[in-house]
Amino acid sequence: KGELIYFADQKNFPYGVKSKKELENIIKDTVNLLEEKFSPDFIIMASNTPTLLLDYSRISKKLAGIYPPLSDAGKISRTRNIAILGTRSVIQSESVTEFIEKCNVPNDIVIHKIDCSLLVELVESGKFLTDEEYCKNIIKEVLEDVFLDNLIDVATLSSTHLPFLEPFLRSIFKNVKFLDPAKNISNVLKDFVENNDLQQNVLRIFTSGDVNLFKKNLQMMGIDDEVNFLTI
């Protein structure tokens, strides 16, 4: 039996406006806490921001990150214009520029980096669960002009908050393909579970924020598991 620990670090949200040093300290403290309390075999850092900004292998060999699937985007774009949708700190960083240079993306592809911090906030606040019209208006405000002006037809959801908005995104931008970066790391985790004979999993959920509010939002998504408080 395997135990899956989900830790929502709401206390330190948003990661997207933190400095590199602040992020490094947060991730170090979080990993230390998780290792001391749970002794995990594998830790997924389910955020593109620290994945791209930090040399996380120096923090722990157990850590795995989530990266924008740019190679996949480049293969399917017909207009040769793709977008990275991410937090402000990622979009403005040299790290994402270096990552782009390392990716196997054809030379004729134009990559547009778009600050989607306002969209991340829609998810973190739970607004996406209660006010569809408001969320769609914010999405249009952030993305509509840049998508249309640049003929963008593929976008990577390079914040793990953004896939929660995918139904809205698809309904507004019917000719744009949105790629979820979590799918690649989920395959890695699946292989790990199968190779270690962990066929039945138990989910335990923790937050460093408001337990009752987080539980309420989870229930609205059909998740009725117990939520406990945990903080670094």
Go through each PLM region and give its residues.
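Non-catalytic structural scaffold of enzyme domains
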Residues: 1-232
